A protein has these predicted regions:
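C-terminal or mid-to-C-terminal helical accessory/interaction module adjacent to the motor/catalytic core
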Residues: 142, 147-148, 154-169
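Conserved phosphate-handling catalytic cores of large alpha/beta enzymes
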Residues: 129
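Phosphate-handling DNA/RNA-contact segment within nucleic-acid enzymes
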Residues: 1-108, 124-126
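Generic structural signal for residues in well-ordered beta-strands
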Residues: 87, 140-142
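Short acidic, glycine/proline-enriched helix-loop-strand junctions
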Residues: 135-139
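Short, acidic/turn-prone active-site loops that include or flank metal/cofactor-
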Residues: 91-96, 117-118, 146
Length: 169
């Protein structure tokens, strides 16, 4: 059966790359469209507008141990592309709560490395997520990349350095 988004054309999605967002069961629950220019607003559109966005990808059963939690889908794609395939995005710092983190725990995830943007807002949100994660029994740490550094903009050499920082003990 077709998802209702395919039954009409919405001009507000022109010029956007659109990602189907699935819940833990694999059902498409929303579409996230990101404009490809930095001048268009809003940068992201979600359809349907009232959709509750899960963590993405929501099914992390293939991940062993820890995930890397990032803010945006392009942050996640960049890390996956460069070999950190345990990256999961939360679709913005205001879209994370204890229930979403508890779903990770139910999938045998035991830790979260929080790699949010290096700006003040990102780091403040990372500290809040750390508290939430620990409340649901996830070992967590805030991994600060530095002032105004975005995980989606990291070059391969920087992702390699991040990998070493996260996994060399």
């Amino acid at each position: 059966k077709r998802f209702e988004a395919f039954l009409h054309h919405d001009r507000s999605f022109n010029g956007r790359i659109v990602f189907p967002i699935r819940d833990i069961t694999g059902k498409v629950v929303a579409f996230n469209g990101r404009h490809m220019t930095m001048t268009e607003r809003p940068k992201y559109l979600i359809y349907p507008p009232q959709a509750v966005m899960p963590l993405f990808p929501s099914n992390v059963k293939s991940v062993k141990g820890k995930i890397i939690l990032v803010e945006g889908i392009f942050d996640m794609i960049n890390l996956h592309d460069k070999g950190l395939t345990n990256a999961v995005c939360c679709f913005g710092t205001s879209n994370i709560d204890a229930d979403k983190l508890a779903i990770l725990k139910m999938q045998n995830i035991d830790g979260v490395d929080i790699v949010f943007d290096g700006d003040e807002a990102g780091q403040s949100a990372a500290e809040n997520v750390k508290v939430l994660a620990e409340k649901v029994g996830l070992v967590s740490r805030n991994v600060n990349l530095g002032a105004n550094i975005d995980p989606g903009a990291l070059a391969e050499v920087k992702v390699h350095s991040l990998r070493e920082r996260l996994y060399s003990s």
